[in-house]
């Protein structure tokens, strides 16, 4: 077995990782894999409860991509069966169960996005209903006997809900058991997940031992901070970057992140060599590299992954045009004001912005106006009751730093 190859694989696998349980067993599995020429089976379970993937979700997918590059077997489990329960990890209350149809529709969308990162030819995708739906009640009782309620209540989220008198449904206890059983069904060598999934990943090790298998290695990836640099990236918090967003949206959002996130994003979200990242770190610390230029480099790397190098270059040009030269973008979405919005010959600006989908609510529009974040024809608006009169010429509206709208009154 080439020692250099073992060292190379370990360096790649350990990049950006938060924790490996246990690391010494990983080394032994890799040695055996290299000696026998047999790839390791690397598993990631995904419950398609929310079909839109953002960069936070891609941290584990990037790690899977690295395993693919090393020649190992990558298996994605679409948890169509477990998604009907919903992962209770970190939840304060029982989650609403999805219908089978909702799960399958979400799974289809998930697959399209996953293959923007992973090589479809090297990815095995399976649904865990293939084995979980076939379990008899006797099988389920046998599975449940492998773990105790006391051990389940060691989980922080369950313990907190139990202590506060919040209900915990029995079926929620089955979620980690079923995820662990996935590892048994696949005879997984390695399972990936976020640090918040540690309990579930270790359940896989426990059950594999109970079923007479060699236990898997649990590799935990860190939870990615959102664009605010504080809270985890989340759609509900509005600090996310979706992989289906336009290059312009991606570029603007990445340029808005705190400088402290630049190197972390490069390590976790790109394939830029660590030597390059470490060199950039030194250059930023010594003032040789401006953090703004480092962000441009990061933005173009990420946009190239999900779009193209040409799209990344164009997004940079557009960003410079809007933010440095204070010009308008080449393409601005248009909105034709419907007649029913016009009242007394005028239309309220907050209503138009909401109706056009530029803001999520009329109250958000009013808040942005009162904060001076809305410009009409490059003039700042402060009146929340500002009205637009029908005009032959369109109104150009800028909301915040990155949202633009061309308002047109039909003749």
Swiss-Prot record:
One Gene Ontology CC term in the entry: cytosol
Major localization class: cytoplasm
PANTHER family, per database record: TYROSINE--TRNA LIGASE, TYROSYL-TRNA SYNTHETASE
Signal peptide range: none
Taxonomic lineage: Bacteria, Bacillati, Bacillota, Clostridia, Thermoanaerobacterales
The protein's name in its UniProt record: Tyrosine--tRNA ligase
Motif interval(s): 'HIGH' region: 48-57
Binding-site positions, ATP: 235
Keyword Nucleotide-binding tagged: yes
Membership in a protein family: Belongs to the class-I aminoacyl-tRNA synthetase family. TyrS type 2 subfamily.
NCBIfam families: tyrS
Annotated EC: 6.1.1.1
Biological processes per GO annotation: tyrosyl-tRNA aminoacylation
Native source species: Carboxydothermus hydrogenoformans (strain ATCC BAA-161 / DSM 6008 / Z-2901)
Pfam hit, one: S4
Encoding gene (name): tyrS
């Amino acid at each position: 077995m080439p020692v250099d190859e073992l060292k190379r694989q370990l360096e790649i696998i350990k990049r950006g990782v938060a924790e490996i349980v246990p690391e010494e067993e990983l080394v032994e599995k890799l040695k055996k894999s290299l000696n026998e020429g047999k790839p390791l089976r690397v598993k990631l379970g995904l419950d398609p409860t929310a079909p839109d993937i953002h960069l936070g979700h891609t941290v584990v997918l990037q790690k899977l991509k690295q395993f693919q590059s090393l020649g190992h077997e990558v298996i994605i489990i679409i948890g169509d069966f477990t998604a009907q329960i919903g992962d209770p990890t970190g939840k304060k209350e029982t989650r609403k169960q999805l219908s089978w149809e909702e799960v399958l529709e979400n799974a289809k969308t998930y697959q399209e996005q996953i293959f923007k990162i992973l090589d479809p030819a090297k990815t095995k995708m399976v649904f865990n209903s293939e084995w979980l739906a076939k379990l008899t009640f006797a099988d389920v009782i046998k599975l449940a006997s492998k773990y105790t309620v006391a051990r389940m209540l060691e989980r922080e989220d369950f313990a907190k809900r139990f202590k506060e008198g919040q209900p915990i449904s029995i079926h929620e206890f089955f979620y980690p058991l079923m995820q662990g059983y996935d590892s048994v069904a696949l005879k997984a060598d390695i399972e990936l997940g976020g640090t918040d999934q540690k309990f579930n990943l270790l359940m896989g090790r426990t059950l594999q031992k109970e079923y007479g298998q060699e236990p898997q290695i649990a590799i935990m990836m860190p939870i990615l901070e959102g664009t605010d640099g504080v809270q985890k990236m989340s759609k509900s918090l509005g600090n996310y970057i979706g992989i289906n967003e336009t290059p312009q949206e991606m570029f603007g959002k990445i340029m808005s992140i705190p400088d402290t996130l630049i190197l972390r994003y490069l390590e976790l979200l790109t394939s830029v060599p660590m030597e390059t990242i470490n060199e950039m770190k030194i250059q930023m610390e010594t003032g040789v590299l401006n953090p703004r230029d480092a962000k441009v480099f990061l933005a173009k790397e990420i946009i190239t992954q999900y779009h193209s190098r040409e799209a990344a270059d164009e997004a940079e040009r557009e960003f410079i045009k809007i933010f440095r030269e204070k010009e308008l973008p080449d393409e601005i979405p248009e909105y034709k004001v419907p007649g029913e919005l016009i009242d007394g010959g005028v239309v309220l600006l907050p209503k138009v912005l909401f109706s056009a989908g530029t803001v999520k609510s009329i109250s958000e529009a009013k808040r942005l106006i009162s904060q001076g974040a809305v410009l009409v024809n490059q003039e700042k608006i402060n009146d929340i009751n500002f009205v637009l009169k029908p005009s032959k010429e369109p109104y150009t509206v800028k909301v915040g730093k990155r949202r633009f709208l061309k308002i047109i009154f039909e003749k």
